[in-house]
UniProtKB/Swiss-Prot annotation:
Species per Swiss-Prot/TrEMBL record: Bos taurus
Domain comment as written in the entry: The histidine box domains are involved in binding the catalytic metal ions.
Name under which the protein is recorded: Stearoyl-CoA desaturase 5
One Pfam short name: FA_desaturase
EC number: 1.14.19.1
Keywords, alphabetical: Endoplasmic reticulum, Fatty acid biosynthesis, Fatty acid metabolism, Iron, Lipid biosynthesis, Lipid metabolism, Membrane, Metal-binding, Oxidoreductase, Transmembrane, Transmembrane helix
Positions bound to Fe cation 1: 99, 104, 136, 140, 280
Residue spans, topological domain Cytoplasmic: 1-54, 99-198, 248-335
PANTHER family cross-referenced by the UniProt entry: ACYL-COA DESATURASE, STEAROYL-COA DESATURASE 5
Tissues expressing the protein: Detected in brain.
Motif Histidine box-3: positions: 277-281
Disulfides per UniProt: none
Binding positions (Fe cation 2): 139, 248, 277, 281
GO MF, one annotated term: stearoyl-CoA 9-desaturase activity
Length: 335
């Protein structure tokens, strides 16, 4: 069973706007009492240089993924199943690992599980755990401001992929430096992955997915590389990005109508349980990232299974009373 809910007033990484409504002044937030200036949506006052290397590499990756589609009929069924299995591992490295464990500390994981999730996270190749988690904490605390790495108020393209095509806004860097990330640096698994990130990415994201089909059931290296590595990697990237873009623009807001994140079932389907985004931004400490627990939430299934095995503990959960009170106070009435 899920662990007891934590006190909402003690939950870390609340958004700046949420702290405003709770009467807590936040430097640089909208209307905050900390004396900071108003955070403006967008980056009109700050030029962000285009990172042409990223533009080129991402364009090349997506072109290669399109080419990969023509190889699907030529590949062995086991290769396609392997590619999907690698996609699930990749997703768990982000959702159960970098997101719910390391960014939000919504549950605790023992060393074997942390090692597994770190390996899966390297397969995801979306920055190392430390950087991913730090930026995600900034995203929650300063959502929809210039300090948000993928500020949805700058449009669909920017929040989906465009934010990777430019250098980080100075506010993202500044706010990130002010966050307390000592818990991340205290984890030897996080430190190891960060130190050897390039090596682990090459092995987990490209070498292992490619060699397994070739070595075990005789798939061609060409098919293995493009399907289990390139296509799988490209799809997993876009699924994660959909949470930043689609789930911040399309859907209802039953828990807090004053924030951008929405409930989006299609994103939930692709991102194995991460599409209950209005709930997640309202109750970021909840390990399930959803009011509905096991209602198509594979990441929650995985964490619960790890708890059953004794590899995870201390799952945090919002109480029913807390959820209903929040719906009545700030929800849009859709649920």
């Amino acid at each position: 069973m899920p662990g007891p809910a934590v006190d909402a007033e003690k939950v870390p990484f609340r958004s700046a706007k949420e702290e405003i409504r709770a009467g807590v002044g936040v430097e640089g937030s909208e209307g905050g009492g900390g004396g900071g200036g108003r955070e403006r949506p967008g980056a009109r006052g700050h030029r962000q240089d285009i990172v042409w290397r990223n533009v080129f590499l991402m364009s090349l990756l997506h072109l290669a993924a399109v080419y990969s589609l023509v190889l699907i009929p030529k590949a062995q069924p086991l290769t396609l199943l392997w590619a999907y299995f690698c996609f699930l591992l990749t997703a768990l490295g982000v959702t159960a690992g970098a997101h719910r464990l390391w960014s939000h500390r919504s549950y605790k994981a023992k060393l074997p599980l942390r090692i597994f999730l770190a390996a899966a996270n390297s397969m995801a190749f979306q920055n190392d755990i430390f950087e991913w988690s730090r930026d995600h904490r900034v995203h929650h605390k300063y959502s929809e401001t210039d300090a948000d790495p993928h500020n949805a108020r700058r449009g669909f393209f920017f929040s989906h992929i465009g934010w990777l095509f430019v250098r980080k806004h100075r506010d993202v860097i500044e706010k990130g430096r002010k966050l307390d990330v000592t818990d991340l640096l205290a984890d030897p698994v996080v430190r190891f992955q960060r130190k050897y990130y390039k090596i682990t990415v090459v092995l987990m994201c490209f070498v292992v997915p490619t060699l397994v089909p070739w070595y075990i059931w005789g798939e061609s290296l060409w098919n293995s590389y493009f399907l289990a590595s390139i296509l799988r990697y490209t799809i997993s990237l876009n699924v994660t990005w959909l949470v930043n873009s689609v789930a911040h623009m399309y859907g209802n807001r039953p828990y807090d109508k004053h924030i951008s994140p929405r409930q989006n079932p299609l994103v939930t389907l692709g991102a194995i349980g991460e599409g209950f985004h209005n709930y997640h931004h309202t109750f970021p400490f909840d390990y399930s990232a959803s009011e509905f627990g096991l209602n198509f939430n594979p990441t929650t299934w995985f964490i619960d299974f790890m708890c059953w095995l004794g590899l995870a503990t201390d799952r945090k959960r919002a109480t029913k009373q807390m959820i209903e009170a929040r719906k009545a106070r700030t929800g849009d009435g859709s649920a």
